[in-house]
Amino acid sequence: MSNTTRSSRVTIGRIGTTPQITDPWSSGLEKQRPSRCGGPKSLAEPTYRKIGRRKMMLHMRVHDPGTTVTQRAKETATAKLNRIYLCTFNRMAQSCIYFVLFLVILSPNTSCALRSSAGETQNYVGILSNDSATTTYDVSSLHSSRRTNPPSSSSSSSSNVDVDYRNDRELHKVDLVGLGGERAGQAETISGGKYDYNYENTHTNASAKDEIVERQSNSLDFDGVDMFGAFSIPEEAIYTNEFAVNIPAGKQMADVIATKHGFINRGQIGSLDNYYLFQHHHVSKRSLRSSRKHQGALKSENEVKWMQQQHEKVRRKRDGPYQDLPTYSPYNLLRQHGGYVVDPNPHLSFSPESISLASHSQRMEYRDVSSHFIFPDPLFKEQWYLNGGAKDGLDMNVGPAWQKGYTGKGVVVSILDDGIQTNHPDLAQNYDPEASFDINGNDSDPTPQDNGDNKHGTRCAGEVAAVAFNNFCGVGVAYNASIGGVRMLDGKVNDVVEAQALSLNPSHIDIYSASWGPEDDGSTVDGPGPLARRAFIYGVTSGRQGKGSIFVWASGNGGRYTDSCNCDGYTNSIFTLSISSATQAGFKPWYLEECSSTLATTYSSGTPGHDKSVATVDMDGSLRPDHICTVEHTGTSASAPLAAGICALALEANPELTWRDMQYLVVYTSRPAPLEKENGWTLNGVKRKYSHKFGYGLMDAGAMVSLAEQWTSVPPQHICKSRENNEDRKIDGAYGSTLSTHMDVNGCAGTINEVRYLEHVQCRITLRFFPRGNLRILLTSPMGTTSTLLFERPRDIVKSNFDDWPFLSVHFWGEKAEGRWTLQVINGGRRRVNQPGILSKWQLIFYGTSTQPMRLKSELLNSSPQLRSPSSSNPFLFPSASNIGQPANEGGNFNTDSFASYLNYQNIFSSAGSDPEPATATLDGQNVTAAIAGGSSAESLGFTASAAQLVAAPETRDGDKKILHSCDAECDSSGCYGRGPTQCVACSHYRLDNTCVSRCPPRSFPNQVGICWPCHDTCETCAGAGPDSCLTCAPAHLHVIDLAVCLQFCPDGYFENSRNRTCVPCEPNCASCQDHPEYCTSCDHHLVMHEHKCYSACPLDTYETEDNKCAFCHSTCATCNGPTDQDCITCRSSRYAWQNKCLISCPDGFYADKKRLECMPCQEGCKTCTSNGVCSECLQNWTLNKRDKCIVSGSEGCSESEFYSQVEGQCRPCHASCGSCNGPADTSCTSCPPNRLLEQSRCVSGCREGFFVEAGSLCSPCLHTCSQCVSRTNCSNCSKGLELQNGECRTTCADGYYSDRGICAKCYLSCHTCSGPRRNQCVQCPAGWQLAAGECHPECPEGFYKSDFGCQKCHHYCKTCNDAGPLACTSCPPHSMLDGGLCMECLSSQYYDTTSATCKTCHDSCRSCFGPGQFSCKGCVPPLHLDQLNSQCVSCCQNQTLAEKTSSAACCNCDGETGECKATSTGGKRRTVVGSGSAYKSSESKHGSFENDGNAREFVLRLDSPLTAITAIAVAICLLIITIFSIIFAVLQRNSNHVSRNSVRYRKIANTSSGRRKNLSAKPTSDARFIFNIGEDDDTDGDNSDDELDGNVGTDINNRIVYDRKGNDHGHEFYIESTNDIDAIEFHCNGAGAQKAETQLQRCNANGDDDDILHYDRHTNAERKNHPSSTTSRTNIRS
């Protein structure tokens, strides 16, 4: 009966009628069931489907008339139990087998955990990497794939890309124009590389509809590495009439070309030298078609190296689009005590009165944060992210930074957005016009249009630098920072606009904050264009005087479209700090995008009506008090400015921070704990938590400034590129299918480009897959960290390709690069895929350092007790991949180059690194390891480790060659194959090709292991492989002495000494010089040049011209602002200022004031007066009275309040405002009434601007240099162009001071003159002090040497030096030894001894080591093997059993597969069998290994990586599950006849009572009673025996009877008005059976008992048949 029939009249039916029931398993449904273990469903059928299917079957069994109960009874309870448990067990076992088999298949491709042959170690063969593989993982397919995959012929043709350059013996040339000559795997170092911007995009799309990728011959390249990927033009681009061109010949040539072809040269693009913007009036301003004619005209010019017609870009602000949400209300949120309320008037001003008017609401309640109210600013209480108002009292922890005095002073931040309101009362005091520009309007005023749509930039600016301690809005994070804005989003946006914004005044602006980007629509893949890319690179290489501009970017608001910020080329860049958002409660906001490029998080808005937003200033042109603030700033747009403000605090704490230092600080100090309520946190390989939502956690301002105070700049950045994997691989279109491929890299080990400590990792991918939004891409590092490079984007259904897109991940920060990297491409989307995709190419680019990057200031470490043990007590020190398990003397905190980032020259050279061989090879090309693998131990031979670290047995044969020991003098003790230096096994000095030599020839140098390697192409002689190691130069090159590089032209800051073909550095502060270091031709930014010297300000009697030079004033002027005698500001002695002139004597009506040095006007009526202003002669009709004042003739008889009118001839009253006068107007007063002041013949209540009160009642004018003053000698504001210093207005500040927006502020105490407040902004030093990199020192600091022109930087090889170049070192950095003035790294057979600062030879048994003695080995001399338990080189034990018993035995149990000591193989690296000449074996040997028995070859499980440990645990769990289920099945099988389960209700209903039975009539009757459902299950306790059923059930039913038959039967029918609350119906047969068995539902025997009774249970929906002894049947009814 249905649930819905609650009150209908329902007929149960005649008791004498028997419904016929059909078993669905024996009917049509039998065809759908393939086995007895389940129906037609998958093994992963959801539970809700199983339940629904069972209910349907039961319903069909009850109502299908095709099957009788007797037929169904044939399936016994035991058979059912067996079937159910056997099927369950079968499924579990099958799942475990599939899982184990999958791990066996997977492990050879990822971690090599399970292997049965040495060949499997190198050559991965499996389903996941085979193009023909399917998703059915069975053993037959495994064998098939192994048989069909051919082996590699040699190690060089391995299918897994191994970045190992042992066979690459030549240095390939680097094409200085493009990338054509770049060697795969080469890497560069930023500190001295050419930033080559000539990149050609060759990755076109499969179809024009996908996207039109512009081919560029001159894109931007960063040391040969394009970091941004292919830039694209929209499918329907709107072209403008502007053309960007690159003309290296300069502006004059650009003007000529523009004029020739009818263009107008609009000038240079931002700070990008030789890049100009052309405009043509005959080209449409907006067109869907490009102008090929004008493009061709520009391309025809040889001087035009690159050009691009500009097209509009779609760029969106990243504030929250709440207007699209139905729950959004634009009301202001106001604070009440104990809660928040919604103000119905959105324009209500933020005042206590307005707050009290609002009614209390219980909807939003947060903790009271009144204890944090330390600012009087009215909106500070709403800035919950600053005052502990987030959940659990958390915030951005800005308070400790403020308490230390860091408020952003001296730091300049610019907001790249839609402009900022410069006159906003909460911003005006901090506004910096030099950090601002209006690109849309092409002027210097960034004020946006006041149309309601351009508030974004102003709001962001308020978060950073809103003025504190005033009565407007709130406070900024860095409330004393200088704030500027760029108006760029309030009009068309193109590549030129972005480049201009990103390169605006990079020497002045420290931090750029941007809260915009491409569309966050879940389908766009876009990034910066070629000019914006160049602006980024120019910023990090040249901004902030070489320390690099800091770019802070909002990660994106595409969360509701499941967008990924890895598809945004701005946040996906290594140059930007990508910032995400967290809600007030510490959760992920609805708009957040997840990606692997996010570095950290700040608080922002959350769910409208639940989480608070950000309070800041607001744009309002009318400055209405109720419109200039807001509490509704939202999205990641609000997060990025908060991060920029925190970075400003850190920059104030340490102005020397580079752009990379800032990223390190953010990574090291961000806190995961406040955001750990949100899932998704993972530990990376150096035990640092990261999240795809929040990066490394919530930024911590207090921790950042504390660490910044101790921070020393990180070492130069190295860039290591892997080989490109160009093998096409199929991406299966089936849902859930995975393409897995891997790459073995060595991190460019052994080269100058080595990366041991990772920062950023880029994975450049080219693939085709439609739709590409289905894809999820994962990258796993050798340390087991998995980073998701791309999440599924369901809206990305139109495009099908990624063209060389560089997916960035910051999750590997601090890990090692060396080892196996695994890339997985997963089809995780539900959209249909018509054909498989193709992974065409992928490549890894590693950014990082070769030495420990974190090196705190040594003086702080030594003086502070809590910092003396950095590894144990400093909270900022983390373990790194390279120093885990290493001794303390490696990877220390010593600063090898404190000034590594001061001189950073761009466009100098392009590095061509090369990789030395890790060990010396024999002259015939055979590896020595293979040649002597069978020899005896090193101890028995008695050899010592030579420079080549080789030993050889006397009788060892290499093929058919016998090793001799009577050899050439150049052969070492290893012997030779014959006479002559070409037959040596190894060399005693150096090796050149196949010959041993005593010294390397010119244009080569000996590398670390004694091989003569060629110098860089520009070097004639060198000390290393790089272009910055030249000692002398190749022909037609100039030697840049201090950099040790060779160039064809001297770079800026150098002059050419043609006599000795060198480039000599100019003196400090010179940007360029000529013929002599002190003869400057241009100066650094913010400096001026006078007589070819650079100063912070022009000297006296000079003025600054437009070209930043100083010119002399006119001879009459002391200071001036122009060249003529009418441009004077102050005068020389004996001259007086009058109308911008300097006069010897003042004109009539003026007198010379010797105190003011000005010509002051005489009193009214005076013709001449003395120097003190006393009249000596009056004008006509004026008379000199007794007080020496001139009065009108005839006024002697007038009273004091009258004047004499010569027209009327009588006295007339003065104006009412005057006390006395000489005329009727209010401008004719000569004195004033009490409480009034006389100002220029007027009586006023107070002096106006430019006057001060003198003698109590007179307003005297300020000095002509002052615009405001409080007395004659105390100016408070100066005229335009003058500087205020201690109340005096001057043309230039005094020595020791600098101009800070018109006010002279003190320089750093060691500076004599300066350009700013920082330590490194000195321009001149006190006498006897030395200037080095902008700082003044008593002596040249470490890393500099004293020259005739100040301190010059040492070569980067040196720690200290006494001259330029790599041969002038006097001490070396750690791990380098001084040898004849040259710092050389220790050989592979040596270790660095810190006490003597020298390289010492390792123990004889060690090939490489980290210390003295035999227990410090890192590598061993064959045939010894490294025992990692004690770092000792030992031989293999001959008797393994004896070795296990004898712990002191100098041997180890060797692995039969690898030949190494057991448990010593390095995780993630390849293993090879010692003695094997190839890294690979044939397919026959691999196939044979599967068929060998266990005695022939051992099947080894190695726990050498995280994945293998997980594999072992998983296998053990599966085996345990199988064992447990086997035991359970055995027990249940034995007791199956006695078990009753809740789902199967076997119930033998007992007779109710003998007394009741006796009262019944003897004639056959039927009885029915209803059992009320009281919420219990009467068999949940389990019926253990028939006796318990007989004894208990009847009593229980009696207690629950609610209806009994009363009266006579009515045709064996009864009616129920409602089935509500009826649990079951019992049918009782009394007396002998009167019906025939075949027509009865119930058959009663002679005793009145039921024979066959059908029970329908409402709880289980299953019918059961009772035993014949039952007397009562129950039919449950579904109520």
Swiss-Prot record:
Disulfide bonds join 473-629, 565-595, 720-748. The keyword Hydrolase applies. Residues 1-42, 139-164, 424-456, 1660-1679 are annotated as: Disordered. It comes from the Eukaryota. InterPro entries: EGF-like_dom (IPR000742), Furin_repeat (IPR006212), Galactose-bd-like_sf (IPR008979), GF_recep_IV (IPR032778), Growth_fac_rcpt_cys_sf (IPR009030), Kexin/furin (IPR034182), P_dom (IPR002884), Peptidase_S8/S53_dom (IPR000209). Residues 147-160 have a biased composition (Low complexity). FU repeats lie at residues 961-1006, 1009-1056, 1060-1104, 1107-1152, 1156-1204, 1208-1253, 1256-1299, 1301-1346, 1348-1393, 1396-1443. Gene3D superfamilies: Galactose-binding domain-like, Hormone Receptor, Insulin-like Growth Factor Receptor 1, Chain A, domain 2, Peptidase S8, pro-domain, Peptidase S8/S53 domain. Its main location: membrane. One of its GO terms (molecular function) is serine-type endopeptidase activity. GO terms for biological process: negative regulation of secretion; protein processing; R8 cell fate specification. It is found in: Membrane. GO terms for cellular component: Golgi membrane; plasma membrane; trans-Golgi network. Pfam families: GF_recep_IV, P_proprotein, Peptidase_S8, S8_pro-domain. Furin is likely to represent the ubiquitous endoprotease activity within constitutive secretory pathways and capable of cleavage at the RX(K/R)R consensus motif. Belongs to the peptidase S8 family. Furin subfamily. This is Furin-like protease 2. The gene is Fur2.
